Regions:
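Ubiquitin-like/PB1-type beta-grasp interaction modules and other compact soluble beta-rich domains
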Residues: 1-66
Length: 67
């Protein structure tokens, strides 16, 4: 089991997962998002290859349109 911090809140997962899988679990896959892992921006092209490990800190921002 791993524990990560997502937007300031601790979350536990049964196994390590990649950024894409995390976005799917959070029901925000496919939306315009910016992901930061341990202070580094994760490009969308790297979401499937970037593994989230125990103790990682993530900030996820979802773009919202408006006017």
């Amino acid at each position: 089991m791993i524990q990560v911090i997502v937007n300031g809140a601790a979350q536990r997962f049964d196994r390590p997962l990649n950024v894409q899988a995390l976005l799917e679990q959070l029901a925000i896959a496919g939306k315009k998002v910016a992901v930061e892992r341990n202070g580094e921006i994760v490009p969308k092209s790297a979401h499937a290859q970037t593994v989230i490990g125990d103790g990682d800190q993530l900030e996820i921002v979802v773009a919202v349109g408006g006017g």
